[in-house]
Amino acid sequence: MNAYFSYEADWLKQRNAWHTAAEIWQQPDLWAALHRQLQDQQAQWQPFLAPLLANPRLQIVLCGAGSSAFAGRALAPWLRERTGRDVAAYGTTDIVANPRQYLDPERPTLLVSFARSGNSPESVATVELADQLLPESYHLMLVCNPDSRLAQYAHQRGNVCSLVMPQGSNDQSFAMTSSFSCMMLSAALLLGPASLEAAQAPLNAMVQRCRTLRETLQPQVKALAASGFRRYITLGGSCFTGLAEEASL
């Protein structure tokens, strides 16, 4: 089996770190696969999203639980700045506790659900509440589990577009890595200002850069891990707030 970050497979497995290392390592490859997949699925999502995004009254709500909520918090400021659209990010636990505080029945709403498992009760309940309370509710579901309740919800409704992230993104480790970055990237590509074609060159550059960094940064990361620190603090503002929250896990 493959070695990751210069650690052999047996060493990683003995320390229950195999999945985590593999899922961190594979991310640039999955990003490239995600772009190809979205191109192949354009006939599925473009007719759904295009008329919604053309509506100046549209409110976009990015939501999820835990790390999935952090993905929305990281992306919302960037989308607001780059597109001029009304974009907010809320945790599904907050929406479920007081939906009328976050969902505006006076405006058409696109609820973007980030979900690794797609089965968490609060994520499913948020979708159901939106359909109950909003006259114009639409759902873009970005999930990693094709058999999840959220993924299946799209088969029952006409106001839903469900996209499953590339195979391998449904992380097996406790921490979300590939799932987090793939869902966040897919939302940026689908809702951002650039077309898929225009985004391809910068995405390819990012993929190649990260493939290089996962090799070249190993000595610095290992030295930092061996330095004996007892506390790890992440800082960030605006887009980096959600990333800092996720990194602290």
Annotate each PLM feature.
Residues 1-30:
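N-terminal amphipathic/basic leader segments beginning at the initiator methionine
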Residues 5-6, 60-62, 111, 231-233:
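A short, structure-level motif marking secondary-structure boundaries and short turns
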Residues 11-14, 113, 210-213:
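Short acidic/polar alpha-helix capping motifs at helix-coil junctions
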Residues 17-20, 62, 67-78, 234-248:
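Conserved phosphate/anionic-ligand binding catalytic regions in large, soluble enzymes, centered on
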Residues 19, 33, 118:
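Short, surface-exposed alpha-helical recognition segments that flank or form part
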Residues 22-23, 28-29, 34-50, 55-57, ...:
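Active-site phosphate/pyrophosphate-binding segments
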Residues 53-204:
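Glycine-rich phosphate-binding loops that contact phosphosugars or nucleotide phosphates
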